[in-house]
Design a protein with these regions (language model features):
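Ligand-binding clefts of soluble mixed alpha/beta catalytic domains
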Residues: 1-243
Length: 243
């Protein structure tokens, strides 16, 4: 079958606030006998590194017949399996759950490795971003999750082809994840786009307020808007003055 779609077609796949298979956005999906087209040409997406670091999806696709590299976020919870070590009889298989939309040491490294491979192949890169940040657990910190996150920045700095970061509907890009794929990392080649229903920011609103709107600012605002408080402060000042 042909793997070339018309360039000016609409992306008709329906997205949800609930976790979903990101491949439906990349490849398109058939629902109720109707084809909903995804971002890339129908039947062109080829995933790589499938069984490693499943919170990140990486592969190659075509867009209007042009080959491109693709990195996307898995929004569903996935299972990570570390097999028992045959050299250690007392070891056991370790099965853990990894939340979607979070970079873990393995998925951060997978992201950096995929960027490097796509750069070496001379392909444009599409990053479909939906990350809340990096895993902050003690185990993941011990496994150097932030070091692998810095590898992502290193690879984007060295990237020579166009990079398009896209935040789809109902997705979010927050905290350290926003910093890692900020287009200012490589202004010459990187651009960022977002659906009007997406959300992004380095800090949550409460965090921004706590930094910008400190205790003294709150006190002045309270006094400006509360006549009773102004009266009490005036009485307190007189009492202190008399003493």
């Amino acid at each position: 079958s042909s793997t070339v779609d018309v360039i000016d077609r609409d992306v008709t796949v329906t997205l949800s606030r609930d976790p979903y298979d990101i491949r439906s956005l990349l490849c398109g999906v058939e629902r109720d006998g109707e084809w909903e087209s995804g971002l890339f040409d129908r039947g062109s997406f080829m995933e790589v590194l499938v069984d490693w670091a499943k919170t990140v999806v990486a592969g190659r696709a075509r867009l209007g017949g042009i080959p491109v590299g693709v990195i996307a976020t898995e929004s569903r919870t996935v299972e990570s399996v570390v097999p028992a070590d045959p050299a250690m009889p007392q070891s056991e298989e370790l099965v853990t759950q990894q939340a979607g939309g979070v970079w873990y040491p393995d998925s951060a490294y997978k992201t950096a490795q995929a960027i490097q491979d796509i750069n070496q192949e001379g392909l444009p890169l599409f990053i479909v971003a939906n990350w809340r940040g990096f895993s902050g657990g003690a185990r993941d910190m011990f496994r150097e999750v932030l070091k692998y996150g810095s590898f992502i920045v290193d690879q984007l700095v060295q990237f020579r082809q166009p990079v398009f970061v896209y935040i789809p509907a109902y997705a979010e890009l927050r905290g350290g994840a926003f910093v890692v794929v900020d287009p200012h990392i490589n202004d010459d080649v990187m651009e960022m786009y977002a659906d009007s229903r997406a959300r992004a920011g380095v800090l949550e609103p409460t965090g921004v307020v706590s930094i910008k709107y400190r205790k003294e600012d709150k006190r002045r605002t309270m006094e400006r808007n509360d006549a009773v408080l102004r009266c009490l402060n005036a009485k307190l000042s007189r009492v202190v003055g008399e003493e």
